[in-house]
Amino acid sequence: MDPEEIKQKKLQEMQAKAQDPEYQRQMQEQQMQYEMQKQKVLRQILSEEARSRLARIKLAKPEFARQVESQLIQLAQAGRLPVPLTDEYFKGLLDKIYEMNKSTKREVTITRR
């Protein structure tokens, strides 16, 4: 078998697996378990005010909120966060994360003549 045939066969297997209802159910279940575990960790490390602030951010900027959640979990697992995280400390972290994102994004401006 040449590499192209192997790629085609694997692609067909993956497509068949993705259409399998049992596989889809398992994937949804794994996703739900991951979300529940993430929420459990966030409840442990965030104060009530910080959790409500994160919920408001999630409504306004879901992608930014996901990034903040993952960074909070990583910092907590590394033991680099005070537990529970106060709202003031959380605001400082949000500012730092926002500044990091702002500096890495490039803006393109198009000027018309």
From Swiss-Prot:
The protein's name: DNA-binding protein Mevan_1162
Bias type Basic and acidic residues, positions: 1-12
Gene Ontology CC terms: cytosol
Coiled coil: none
HAMAP family: dsDNA_bind
UniProtKB keywords: DNA-binding
Top-level taxonomy: Archaea, Methanobacteriati, Methanobacteriota, Methanomada group, Methanococci
Organism: Methanococcus vannielii (strain ATCC 35089 / DSM 1224 / JCM 13029 / OCM 148 / SB)
Family the UniProt entry places it in: Belongs to the PDCD5 family.
Entry GO MF terms: DNA binding
Top-rank taxon: Archaea
Ranges for region Disordered: 1-22
